[in-house]
């Protein structure tokens, strides 16, 4: 149990069977009445953000999360198979459990998997990854002056918008949080 007075940004708590991460908190002590803590909570499972108010000193169940470094080894019948880098145990996850990050997974890629009570809550990909462009429209000389973008399909099947000068076979860096092009990989 944790007191609402001890909330900090990043603290994880459990309310009604769901795990929430404290994004913002504010201790309020009004002139009349008792003090309270106003919080903004983000669901670890689906990313929903809610505002909730707690009485000062109210006890809440703290959620202790386990983080494991796993390596993606292969895909078998729709499941992604990961290997723990320390114990060498295999973990199978569906694309639903991985979420939108499944479109960036390559064999050999290391990810952080967050567990709560032996259930997968979240798969954290590296923020920036390097992938090869497998399909895109050819760039025409002189196109770069307009600063436009075009769609490109990467080796994992993910689609991102890239500048017009990018061609098939180039290695590019992609931000996995918002599917944006970061630059060429040298």
UniProtKB/Swiss-Prot annotation:
GO CC entries: cytoplasm
UniProt main location, coarse: cytoplasm
Keyword Cytoplasm: yes
UniProt similarity note: Belongs to the elongation factor P family.
A Pfam family annotated for this UniProt entry: EFP
GO biological process per UniProt: peptide biosynthetic process
The keyword Glycoprotein appears for this protein: no
Annotated function: Involved in peptide bond synthesis. Stimulates efficient translation and peptide-bond synthesis on native or reconstituted 70S ribosomes in vitro. Probably functions indirectly by altering the affinity of the ribosome for aminoacyl-tRNA, thus increasing their reactivity as acceptors for peptidyl transferase.
Gene Ontology terms for molecular function: translation elongation factor activity
Origin organism lineage: Bacteria, Bacillati, Cyanobacteriota, Cyanophyceae, Synechococcales
PANTHER family: ELONGATION FACTOR P (PTHR30053), ELONGATION FACTOR P (EF-P) FAMILY PROTEIN (PTHR30053:SF12)
SMART domains xref list: EFP (SM01185), Elong-fact-P_C (SM00841)
Record-linked InterPro entries: Elong-fact-P_C (IPR015365), NA-bd_OB-fold (IPR012340), Rib_uL2_dom2 (IPR014722), Transl_elong_fac_P/YeiP (IPR020599), Transl_elong_KOW-like (IPR013185), Transl_elong_P/YeiP_cen (IPR001059), Transl_elong_P/YeiP_CS (IPR013852), Transl_elongation_fac_P (IPR011768)
Pathway: Protein biosynthesis; polypeptide chain elongation
Transmembrane annotation, as ranges: none
Protein's UniProt name: Elongation factor P
